[in-house]
Amino acid sequence: MPAAICPGWAEEKHLWKQGFSSIAGLDEAGRGCLAGPVVAGAVIMPPRLKGDWVAMVRDSKVLTPEKREYLYCHIVSMAISFGVGVVDNTQIDCLGIAPATRLAMKQAVEHLDCRPDFLLVDYLKLPDIPLPQKGIVDGDALCFSIACASIIAKVSRDRLMCELEATYPGYHLAKHKGYGTALHMECISQKGISPIHRRTFAPLKSMFDVI
């Protein structure tokens, strides 16, 4: 298996040279899940970061849960500002996943303590946010700020899903985090669809056994 790509600072350095000083990375977690919210992270990182952890930052999807938690602590402690947006399954079913993801990202930006002057976004364009921005394909693998945002989003969502396990026992949410794993599908077949499941997502839209 090839080594994961190390995200770089090329985008940020280019923007700093143009005069932008408050550059926020944005990414989401939970877009493809069958249960729970979609969560977005926004983060403004300072230049010239130091520490062994900096070289460990990657797209959250290629990191172990333990390493994500470790990096999350360093990222939020060193960030100029960070914000999290959460859009629940009811809103996802009403809006659709793409608009819901954009809404979560908008919330994350609004929760920043300082207003960014440029957004670096993983893949998406955000027309509802009136700020200069750039959507980058595979941005979470290529861009340091977006990779940091991906870790914030993933850890924030995973923690929320672990909390929801107490409210919805028997679904093992802490294990699969709402993704469509074999374990999750077995739980659904035994218990039916819960109030936090996304009813418009296949194969759940054909099930109506709501607890």
Curated annotation (Swiss-Prot):
It catalyses: Endonucleolytic cleavage to 5'-phosphomonoester. GO terms for cellular component: cytoplasm; ribonuclease H2 complex. Keywords: Cytoplasm, Endonuclease, Hydrolase, Manganese, Metal-binding, Nuclease. The keyword Nuclease applies. It is found in: Cytoplasm. Its EC number is 3.1.26.4. This is Ribonuclease HII. It comes from Dehalococcoides mccartyi (strain ATCC BAA-2266 / KCTC 15142 / 195) (Dehalococcoides ethenogenes (strain 195)).
